[in-house]
Amino acid sequence: MSEDIIDRSLELGIQCFQGEDYKGAAELFSKSLQLARSYTDRSLEGIREKVGLPKRCLHDPSRVYHPRYLVLLDNRAATWEKLNKLDRALADAAYMITVDAYNLKGYIRRGKVLQKLGRYEEALQVYENGLKQAGEAEKTHAIHAPQKFLDIVYRQRSTIKELLQSRARSSRSLTQQTVAKEPKLKRPATIDSLMPGKKRSSSKAKIDYIATLPVEIIERIMANMDTRSIIRCYSVCKLWKYRLERLPHLYQEFRLSCCYKNMLGYVNFVGALASRTAEYSCRSIQCVSGNVQEEEKSIILLLSRLMIGTRQLALMAKKCKAERIIQHICENKKLRNGVQRLSITAPVHFGHKLNLHELYTRTTSMTHLELVLNFHTPSEHVGGHLFPWQDHAVAETNLESFTLMARNYSVHHVNVIEQFEYSSVLFKRLKKLCITGIDFRLGDRNNLKWISDMPNLQELWLERNTGIEFHELITQIVQVGAPKTLRHLTFREPPNRHFDRMDQSQLGLGEEALREVFQSLESLDLMNTRFDPQLLLLLLQPACENRIARLNIGNCPRLSFARDLEILTLIFQQLPALTDLLLPNVMEYTRQGMEVLRKNIKGMKLKRLDLSFIPSLKGYELLDLLKELKGINPLGLETLTINGCTAVAPQTVDYITRNGYAQKVMCAYERTQWEHLGINSFWYR
């Protein structure tokens, strides 16, 4: 229990430090240190052994400390530095070396504090001692210091040496000047022969490089400038304006912030370029929310007065409504005709005014659309009606990719759901569809027929949507027999969904029908989804021609690593072409489940493995698995991810990388929170 208190206090202290509450952080770290010192030696030995550390300190077997003691000291020393209490920081840094003389953290902390105090000779000696101890640890105990710590020590040592040498040279030079100093005659002021009575300026005349340099050199200068710098240069004088306007091919990518003054300068700048070059257009324009007070009028200014086309337009707003953004895009002929990739991140206040029909009709060149919408809760007095799609002719679009993300649930979802009734026309060419956070219970689209109306769909991503069930999706696709080109399927249910007991036998899915529609499947992601394991086995069998290269079955409530060992064996045997296996937070993890994976890993081509958030995963179990894999592939894994695996010690991670079991290991013990919404993050970071 007290271990949990120490970890919790450490986490709270870090939060206080990040929130700049340094006094609160120092107090929390001090209390945690006091608690860590309250253990008996026998208790500390048990705790250290539990996390994979030696019972006693390697550098001094007579000492034993809590595993978190060094981290707590380091954090408190950093806090003292922020509070400008360098003497206390120095004391904590010195004690860090006493706690673990083989860890370079203490030497780095102590050296930097000494540098702040101006005691450079002592700091240099500290860094030298740290490198000496690191060498001894490697020679005696085969412990390799992390490369990033070695780089810091070498860099700081080099900096101090250069500083001391510079001081020595300056001191010698000053001494020589003092000894050899002689009186010198002052040079009389030079009189300019062309300007009688006026002294010639000793300083060099300033040169206007933009006015004098060749165009080729100006191009190289301007090519390395950001949008803000370009606009400022454009406003310097008429000559600069004249020369910059004649280089339109340089200005292809713009990143703007919502400052009205800067936005006005940008609009005038591209307007001048367009007036000189009729066919001028740029590659991309990205506008991010800066000044919230000026955001709406800045975005409206951009969309209404922009006189050029752009192939890619990304707008991120916190206040400006998506309804107005879409309206102004549709009204700007130059903009709507040229945009191919459109991304809008904005709030929605009135869903019935979100005129997607007009957007599809007018942006005829658009192939990629991304909508990230924050739906506001409607007021009771606001009356809105669905946009009458049936009253308008629905034109065929060129969309190849469509992403629809809702940050919150709302009755306004019905206004974006209705478009899927016309999937056979709107999304006939669609290859990638991503929908997350939508409540499909509000409309009539929860029968999923609209998905089978997209014959060219290759990638389908459905995450945290309400009103859509996984078994219903599979049944619909199989019954209709479309889409047959599906290569990537991701289905993740919302959290806290009701438990679904639907079994595969109740679906009536035949193996031949499954093979017909899922024979091209290359990746399958069912994280956090409740499904009958037999259904997963059926989905993998059609891909027996070794197409499945990526599988994510982490956090699946009905797939147990304790009770479903036979099914797991069959699943892993169906994956001979697998390169990416993701098993974060697997249900009911047991050693027997890991043994099933180890025995069947020989039949895979594994390059990347994710075993994050399995607290009971032991280091020796992981090593047994990696040794089995290295017997097949001498190069080992490209990437091993074990975030949140608290039972795997840092020494084990170091051993894995040192012996080539994995080229890159991602291991962060602090990542203990699932993320609310993250389409490419597996819900945690």
Curated annotation (Swiss-Prot):
The species this protein belongs to is Eremothecium gossypii (strain ATCC 10895 / CBS 109.51 / FGSC 9923 / NRRL Y-1056)
PROSITE patterns documented for this protein = FBOX (PS50181), TPR (PS50005), TPR_REGION (PS50293)
Functional note: F-box protein component of a SCF ubiquitin ligase complex involved in ubiquitin-dependent protein degradation. The SCF-DIA2 complex is specifically involved in the pheromone induced degradation of phosphorylated TEC1. Involved in DNA replication, genome stability, and the control of cell cycle, probably through its association to replication origins to facilitate the ubiquitination of another origin-binding protein.
Q: InterPro entries annotated for this entry?
A: F-box-like_dom_sf, F-box_dom, LRR_dom_sf, TPR-like_helical_dom_sf, TPR_rpt
Q: Report the family membership.
A: Belongs to the DIA2 family.
Q: What is the protein's given name?
A: Protein DIA2
- Is Oxidoreductase among the key words of this record? no
The TPR repeat boundaries are 6-39, 70-103, 104-137
Start and end residues of each F-box domain: 207-254
Q: Cite the SUPFAM superfamilies for this sequence.
A: F-box domain (SSF81383), RNI-like (SSF52047), TPR-like (SSF48452)
Spell out the GO cellular component terms annotated for this protein, sorted alphabetically and separated by semicolons. nucleus
Its keywords, alphabetically, are: Cell cycle, Leucine-rich repeat, Nucleus, Repeat, TPR repeat, Ubl conjugation pathway
- Residues crossing the lipid bilayer are none
Gene Ontology terms, MF aspect:
Hsp90 protein binding
| Major subcellular site | nucleus
